[in-house]
C-alpha cells in the first residue's frame, strides 16, 4: 500500500465478507448492503476529517454507479462527474472508474475517460478479493489518481477552474 495516512484511512473502512457479483442474485443483495455500509462509513470518516471529496449513487440493481468527485487546488474546487459499471465478474474484477470530461487529457487514462489503475491498484485489489469494495476503490483508486493527475493537468493548463473560464 502507500503511506501511513493511507493505511489508517483504509483500516477504518469496513471490509466486505460476501463474495458475490451481479449474477449471484440473493448474494448480490447481501453484497450491496455491505457495499453501502462500507461507503457510508468511509464518507462519514471523510466528513469527520474535513476531507469530503465525492458522492456516489447507483441504479436500483446496484450495477451502474455515478456521482461527483471534487479536488481542491489553490483553494479552488474542481468538480468532475464520475461513473462506472460493476463488472459481471465482480468482485474478482475491479470496476473501471470513468471521468468523462477528462477523456483524452492525460496519458493515465483509457478511451472513454476510464482512469488507469492497472499498475498500482489492480494488484492490490486482486490480493484483497472479496474484502475490498467500492469504498476501497475510491480510497485507493480514484483518490490517489486525482491527487496526482489534477494538479498536473492544472499546471499544464489542460483544465481550468470554471470561474476562471467564465471571466
UniProtKB/Swiss-Prot annotation:
One of the GO BP terms on file: response to endoplasmic reticulum stress
Signal peptide as annotated in the record: none
Record: active site: 116
Entry keyword Ubl conjugation: yes
Covalent S-S links between cysteines: none
Molecular function (Gene Ontology), one example: UFM1 transferase activity
Modifications made to the protein after synthesis: Ufmylated at Lys-122. Deufmylated by UFSP1.
Biological role: E2-like enzyme which specifically catalyzes the second step in ufmylation. Accepts the ubiquitin-like modifier UFM1 from the E1 enzyme UBA5 and forms an intermediate with UFM1 via a thioester linkage. Ufmylation is involved in various processes, such as ribosome recycling, response to DNA damage, interferon response or reticulophagy (also called ER-phagy).
Name of the molecule in the record: Ubiquitin-fold modifier-conjugating enzyme 1
Species, as recorded: Bos taurus (Bovine)
Name of the gene: UFC1
Amino acid at each position: 500500500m502507500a503511506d501511513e495516512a493511507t493505511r489508517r484511512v483504509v483500516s477504518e473502512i469496513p471490509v466486505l465478507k460476501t463474495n458475490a457479483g451481479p449474477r449471484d442474485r440473493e448474494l448480490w443483495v447481501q453484497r450491496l448492503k455491505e457495499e453501502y455500509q462500507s461507503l457510508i462509513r468511509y464518507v462519514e470518516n471523510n466528513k469527520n476529517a474535513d476531507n469530503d471529496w465525492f458522492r456516489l449513487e447507483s441504479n436500483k440493481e446496484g450495477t451502474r454507479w455515478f456521482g461527483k468527485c471534487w479536488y481542491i487546488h489553490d483553494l479552488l474546487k474542481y468538480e468532475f462527474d464520475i461513473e462506472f459499471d460493476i463488472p459481471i465478474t465482480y468482485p474478482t474484477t475491479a470496476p473501471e472508474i470513468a471521468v468523462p470530461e477528462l477523456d483524452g487529457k492525460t496519458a493515465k487514462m483509457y478511451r472513454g475517460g476510464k482512469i488507469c489503475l492497472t499498475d498500482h491498484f489492480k494488484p492490490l485489489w486482486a490480493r484483497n478479493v472479496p474484502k475490498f469494495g467500492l469504498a476501497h476503490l475510491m480510497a485507493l483508486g480514484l483518490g490517489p489518481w486525482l491527487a496526482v493527475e489534477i494538479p498536473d493537468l492544472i499546471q499544464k493548463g489542460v483544465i481550468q477552474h470554471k470561474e476562471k473560464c467564465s471571466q
